[in-house]
Amino acid sequence: MPKQKAAKKDHYQYSDLSSIKKEGEEDQYHFYGVVIDASFPYKGEKRYVVTCKVADPSSVAKGGKLNTVNVVFFSQNFEDLPIIQRVGDIVRVHRARLQHYNDAKQLNVNMYYRSSWCLFIGNDKEAPLEPKVENEDGTNNYFSYTPYNFSGKSFTQEGHETKILKDLKKWSKDYFSNNDVVEQVKKADIETAMKNKTDFDLLAKVTEISDNDQYTNTVSLNDSTGQTWTGHLFKRKFPHLVKGDVLRIKSVSAKEDNSLIFSSHSNILKFFSFSSIHKKLKSSISSDTHIKTCVTKIDKAAHNKMDITPLKKLFFNPKKSEKLFRSQFSVLKVDTKNLEDYVGAFDGKKWHSYKGKKTPKDAELRWNIKLIVTDYKNQQDDKAYMIHLDDNSFFKGINPANWSNAATKKKAEKAFSVLTNNKVNYVDAILERDKKNYHIRHTQFK
């Protein structure tokens, strides 16, 4: 660990956030603040940037509302900026300048104007997530007053700062234990953002993490609005996630199938265990894993690259210019319980009942099945839809022309049992639109 520098003779005077009011080039401020929110470092038009919100005891207004202050870090280099991934950690800043942006107080931290920062843990009982320094003495309280990350090669620290940190941690633990700190996310706001293709935030619980390769993994999440999401993450950017974590996910967008899109500024933040919001999310969000086995495969590579369209959009607002769509659904049941009704005779114009009878002239025995399905990805859509299965190539090795054969029927019965086991299985299929109906095409049962 780089050595701590001796304190300068003219020591730093730290300001309460509410007392910072004078705006000017010559006015520089030093302060401590508890992190309420933060972006990941990202490249702006000319510089790398981190935006965050901080608070201290002076930020509490009448009624207990927290008036946070925006802090923006600027640098020519990514490495000079703080990576903040926990609500409640503490940031110390030297030489910030005040400006008002959109009528809000903003403290600018310009690393190329000799500004500096340090990050401290907000709870002595929980280790730092990504420490820049090692715990050299091996004690549990090593990071209580030692920053776990800082700008530059070294940091200065004076004796009176120990009390500042101690008091700030005491206040934040009390405030966070009795207040949610971050705003609840509304389902309507998410829907509006997705419609407008803009960013939104989530409060969510990790239900599953699976490795893709040495660089990435896939995470499944249940959120506070009852929706399920998936995301592909870089392990290096978010290395500390584990199953069961409750999180604030900042500034993401999403595709229609609820797969999240993480931009360079998107961030994932944890909460301290004493936080009221942590306890509420932990108990209120389901831990059930919404991962099932796909029992089908799409037979063309080009079709596999198609975006997944929610069933609700297919049936209520489809793209009129397109005929083929890709969708994922769970089969609740077949429209008829009688296995004999699964096969019909089609003469090219209309269907004829078969039921073991002789096939009408110029007619072909085909599957004639109506599947009652629900959307696999979009759990918030509680509607049931009808999908038609009349493609003989869907079940490999089961030919409707052999329907009178007992072995064929037994094989079909087993396949349908798997297909309709919606608790553990789902279908990924290409659907062809025929007026208001959708038929499975270019898809095979595994």
Swiss-Prot record:
Q: Which organism is this protein's natural source?
A: Euplotes crassus
Q: Which terms in the GO cellular component ontology are assigned?
A: nuclear telomere cap complex
Q: Which domain of life is it from?
A: Eukaryota
Q: Could you provide one GO biological process annotation from this protein's UniProt record? A: regulation of telomere maintenance via telomerase
InterPro entries for this protein: NA-bd_OB-fold, POT1, TEBP-like_OB2, Telomer_end-bd_POT1/Cdc13, Telomere-bd_alpha
Q: Which ranges does the record mark as transmembrane?
A: none
UniProt KW keywords: Chromosome, DNA-binding, Nucleus, Telomere
Q: Which family would the database say this protein is a member of? A: Belongs to the telombin family.
- In Swiss-Prot or TrEMBL terms, this protein is called Telomere-binding protein 51 kDa subunit
The lineage is: Eukaryota, Sar, Alveolata, Ciliophora, Intramacronucleata
Record's keyword annotation contains Transport: no
Quaternary structure and partners: Monomer.
This molecule's function is given as: May function as protective capping of the single-stranded telomeric overhang. May also participate in telomere length regulation during DNA replication. Binds specifically to the T4G4-containing extension on the 3'strand and protects this region of the telomere from nuclease digestion and chemical modification.
List the molecular function annotations (GO) for this entry.
G-rich strand telomeric DNA binding; telomerase inhibitor activity
Q: Where in the cell is it found?
A: Nucleus; Chromosome, Telomere
